[in-house]
């Protein structure tokens, strides 16, 4: 299950999101307040994309992740966003790239990966219950991998990230 606006069309077991021409955010529905969590987002098509995490109470009608203080996003230009403020962060990304999101609620940090290359810790001092999220200006397609599909629904995954048990 997911939380979104009508700007998105959902398919493939709620793992593929196609966004229309409207602003909006789509969020996973299982929030995390402790532990270490990881997902990958395949960037299939579009422009002006953003991936990240948001408090489970954040509004899906916001223009983008990080528009308010309850979200933390990594924009396709390489900037990071929170509280409606942008700053330099990592490499830009484009169609065909896979963006990993490592949410460490024990340390209160979120780190982003581009094609399995860490961009460094983007944000710290996170507290509360967070969900994974994507969104943009419209017209983009995303595929999410929460570990269910090592082939990434036919798209190549960055893989290589494992927990302490090697999984």
Regions found by a protein language model. Give the residues of each.
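PRY/SPRY (B30.2) beta-sandwich protein-interaction domains
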Residues: 1-167
């Amino acid at each position: 299950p997911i939380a979104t606006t009508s700007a998105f069309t959902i398919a493939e077991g709620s793992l593929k999101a196609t966004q229309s021409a409207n602003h909006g955010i789509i969020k996973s529905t299982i929030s995390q307040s402790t532990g270490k969590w990881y997902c990958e987002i395949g960037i299939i098509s579009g422009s002006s994309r953003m991936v990240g995490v948001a408090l489970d109470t954040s509004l899906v009608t916001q223009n983008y992740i990080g528009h308010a203080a309850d979200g933390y996003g990594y924009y396709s230009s390489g900037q990071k966003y929170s509280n409606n403020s942008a700053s330099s962060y990592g490499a830009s990304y484009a169609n065909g790239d896979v963006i990993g999101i490592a949410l460490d609620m024990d340390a209160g940090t979120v780190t982003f990966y581009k094609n399995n290359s860490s961009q460094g810790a983007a944000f710290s001092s996170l507290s509360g219950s967070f969900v994974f999220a994507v969104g943009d200006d419209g017209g983009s397609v995303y595929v999410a991998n929460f570990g269910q599909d090592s082939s990434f629904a036919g798209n190549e995954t960055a893989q290589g990230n494992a927990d302490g048990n090697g999984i």
